[in-house]
């Protein structure tokens, strides 16, 4: 039996249950068994039943007729050619043979289709399905001498909530129906209507009707959909609300910053704020940008490894760098090629270009420059086959040793000295406990785990929160959170020196999500909104140092909480849902 074509069973009801909340399964009685066994179901008709003779005899007759008539006609054809008799002159016998050949051919052609399609054209009746159910029940019934199986009550799932939809104008209703029917592609609504808000509303309504699921809790109003058209998000149906908290003031390089953090994790902002307080009282933190360069690494292939090596020698030759830089820098007035590094894997070459990108994060900028260089290289290397503009030697949105060692984006180190009395009063721990915990957890523990750039407590928490608040690419949190946290007792063990080194902070203050109203406001709060008018790239570098400073504060506070044994207590107080989940679950499973 083909289970794919089997209709669903009707729902089981229990007349003994007045409220309908439960249904019971009980073994059938013996009288039911006798009645079921006495039931007979007529087999469904088949297409082959219409033949006057049994199928095997009919097949034998037509197979014999087809080949014998074909042999006879071929024999007559040869005789006519031999005696120069026109082929169109036929006798009655030959005419009958031709008709028999055509008839047998038609039958044989139809025969091979009958057996193939008759299982599809003959559908089993509802009684047949009942018979199959009867057989299945008999097969699964176990004959035992033990007492009957107790009744098992199965709770019904609650009915889904009805979809709450807004009433739309008649014209919009027609468009919604066209989207559902596939007449109008959903992605083309903005260009067809010329109104991004209206397009999102129509797409949202079509989505609810197609899926049968309500998205009433996803807000639609209060967002500028024009600002994301063609650059931030396609086919929008609403926007997500994430709370933004402020940690600070963060005293960094002599300036005070109020750091916006978009997060749904309790304790995160409070903990970072405590770290900022300890650093502020101790005189603040200082930061240094070690390197500023975005990378892109295409992969190219040659016929031999020797030829790929020739490209490597050409690109890494200092005499050729100026020419490559001129070609590369055409992509933007802010793009400045810094270095070219090439590595070989067989006959494949991976070329890592690094360039400064001003206040932009710079992925598009460096990709354009790489494209210019690849087109230029085809003159000297016509046999070069460009496989991809990115060969993962960049490496973007993936944990990679090349970023940990060489850096990508902004490489920043941030440090602070926290006085011993501040450690005791504000952080509720001791210098010795912090130093020991950092060595065993962040250094030795991460090494035991085989961590790549994860020699820290929770750098990604702070990086992600600041990234979302300021319009950065959240996916680049992967490499941007690579961090090593160092702690050392100084001044005869009275104070502690803490630092974070982050080689791959990928941020920008122009382009992408930084132009959105909420994210732009957070950048303005930090004083790094838009491009720097003083020096290209200054705002982006300052944002990177703020990220590192916030990470430093977060590391200091969390490590202190762990050393003092406060982590579990604080999270149980501030990072738990206040809802009675067990009660809600019980209500859901016991009510209709």
From Swiss-Prot:
Segments of skewed composition (Polar residues): 12-28
Catalysed reactions, as listed in the record: (R)-mevalonate + 2 NADP(+) + CoA = (3S)-3-hydroxy-3-methylglutaryl-CoA + 2 NADPH + 2 H(+)
First and last residue of the signal peptide: none
Region of interest called Linker, as start-end residue ranges on this chain: 118-171
Activity regulation, per record: Regulated at the post-translational level in response to alterations of sphingolipid and sterol biosynthetic pathways. Negatively regulated by a PP2A-dependent dephosphorylation occurring at a site different than Ser-577. Completely inhibited by mevinolin (IC(50) = 12.5 nM). Reversibly inactivated by phosphorylation at Ser-577 by spinach or Brassica oleracea HMGR kinases in a cell-free system. Down-regulated by KIN10 through its phosphorylation at Ser-577.
GO cellular component labels: endoplasmic reticulum; endoplasmic reticulum membrane
Induction data: Down-regulated by light in immature leaves, but not in roots. Not regulated by myriocin, squalestatin or terbinafine.
Keywords: Endoplasmic reticulum, Glycoprotein, Isoprene biosynthesis, Membrane, NADP, Oxidoreductase, Phosphoprotein, Transmembrane, Transmembrane helix
Keyword Phosphoprotein carried by entry: yes
Coiled coil: none
PTM notes: Inactivated by phosphorylation at Ser-577 by KIN10 activated form. Probably also phosphorylated at additional sites.
GO MF annotation terms: hydroxymethylglutaryl-CoA reductase (NADPH) activity
Stretch list, region Disordered: 1-45
Effect of residue 577 to A: Abolishes the inactivation of activity by KIN10
Annotated glycosylation sites: 16, 19, 329, 575
Residues annotated as transmembrane: 47-69, 97-117
Pathway field: Metabolic intermediate biosynthesis; (R)-mevalonate biosynthesis; (R)-mevalonate from acetyl-CoA: step 3/3
Residues bearing the modification Phosphoserine: 577
Example of a GO biological process term: coenzyme A metabolic process
Annotated EC: 1.1.1.34
Region Catalytic, annotated ranges: 172-592
Subunit structure, interactors included: Interacts (via N-terminus) with B''ALPHA and B''BETA.
Domain notes: The N-terminal domain (1-178) of the short isoform is necessary and sufficient for directing the protein to the endoplasmic reticulum and to spherical structures.
Family, as annotated: Belongs to the HMG-CoA reductase family.
Name of this protein: 3-hydroxy-3-methylglutaryl-coenzyme A reductase 1
Gene: HMG1
């Amino acid at each position: 039996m083909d289970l794919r074509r089997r209709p669903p069973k009707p729902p089981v009801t229990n007349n003994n249950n007045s409220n309908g909340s439960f249904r019971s399964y009980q073994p059938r009685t013996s009288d039911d068994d006798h009645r079921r066994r006495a039931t007979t179901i007529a087999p469904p008709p088949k297409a082959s039943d219409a033949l006057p003779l049994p199928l095997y005899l009919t097949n034998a007759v037509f197979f014999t007729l087809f080949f014998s008539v074909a042999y006879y006609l071929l024999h007559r054809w040869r005789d006519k050619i031999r005696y120069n008799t026109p082929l169109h002159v036929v006798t009655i016998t030959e005419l009958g043979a031709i008709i028999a050949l055509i008839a047998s051919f038609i039958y044989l052609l139809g025969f091979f289709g009958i057996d193939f399609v008759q299982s599809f054209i003959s559908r089993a009746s509802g009684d047949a399905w009942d018979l199959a159910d009867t057989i299945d029940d008999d097969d699964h019934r176990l004959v035992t001498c033990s007492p009957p199986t107790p009744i098992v009550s199965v709770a019904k799932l609650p009915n889904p909530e009805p979809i709450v939809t807004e009433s739309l104008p008649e014209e919009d209703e027609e468009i919604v129906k066209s989207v559902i029917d596939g007449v109008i592609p959903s992605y083309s609504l903005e260009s067809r209507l010329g109104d991004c808000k209206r397009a999102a509303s129509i797409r949202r309504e079509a989505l609810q009707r197609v899926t049968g699921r309500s998205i009433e809790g996803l807000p639609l109003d209060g967002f500028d959909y024009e600002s994301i058209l063609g650059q931030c998000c396609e086919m929008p149906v609403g926007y997500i609300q994430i709370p933004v908290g402020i940690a600070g003031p963060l005293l960094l390089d002599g300036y005070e910053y109020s750091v916006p953090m978009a997060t749904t994790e309790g304790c995160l902002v409070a903990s970072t704020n405590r770290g900022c307080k300890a650093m502020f009282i101790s005189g603040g933190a200082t930061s240094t940008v070690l390197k500023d360069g975005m990378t892109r690494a295409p992969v190219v292939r040659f016929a031999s490894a020797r030829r790929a090596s020739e490209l490597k020698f050409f690109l890494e030759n200092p005499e050729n760098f100026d020419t490559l830089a001129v070609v590369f820098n055409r992509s933007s007035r802010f793009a400045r090629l810094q270095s070219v590094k090439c590595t070989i894997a067989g006959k494949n070459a991976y070329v890592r270009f690094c360039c400064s990108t001003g206040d932009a994060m710079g992925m598009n900028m460096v990709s354009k420059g790489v494209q210019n260089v690849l087109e230029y290289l085809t003159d000297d290397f016509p046999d070069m086959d460009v496989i991809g503009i990115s060969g993962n030697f960049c490496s973007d949105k993936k944990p990679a040793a090349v970023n940990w060692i060489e850096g990508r984006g902004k490489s920043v180190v941030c440090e602070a000295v926290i006085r011993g009395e501040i450690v005791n009063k504000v952080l509720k721990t001791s210098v010795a406990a912090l130093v020991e915990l950092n060595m065993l957890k962040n250094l030795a523990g991460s090494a035991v785990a085989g961590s790549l750039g994860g020699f820290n407590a929770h750098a990604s928490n702070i990086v992600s929160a600041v990234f979302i608040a300021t319009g950065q690419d959240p996916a680049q949190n992967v490499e941007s959170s690579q961090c090593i946290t160092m702690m050392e007792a100084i001044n005869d063990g009275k104070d502690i020196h803490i630092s974070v080194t982050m080689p791959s902070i990928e941020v920008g203050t122009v382009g992408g999500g930084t132009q959105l109203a909420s994210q732009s406001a957070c950048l303005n709060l930090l004083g790094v909104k838009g491009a720097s008018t003083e020096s290209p790239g200054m705002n982006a570098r300052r944002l990177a140092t703020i990220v590192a400073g916030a990470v430093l504060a977060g590391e200091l506070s969390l490590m202190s909480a762990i050393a003092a044994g406060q982590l579990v207590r604080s999270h149980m107080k501030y990072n738990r849902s206040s809802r009675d989940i067990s009660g809600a679950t019980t209500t859901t499973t016991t009510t209709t």
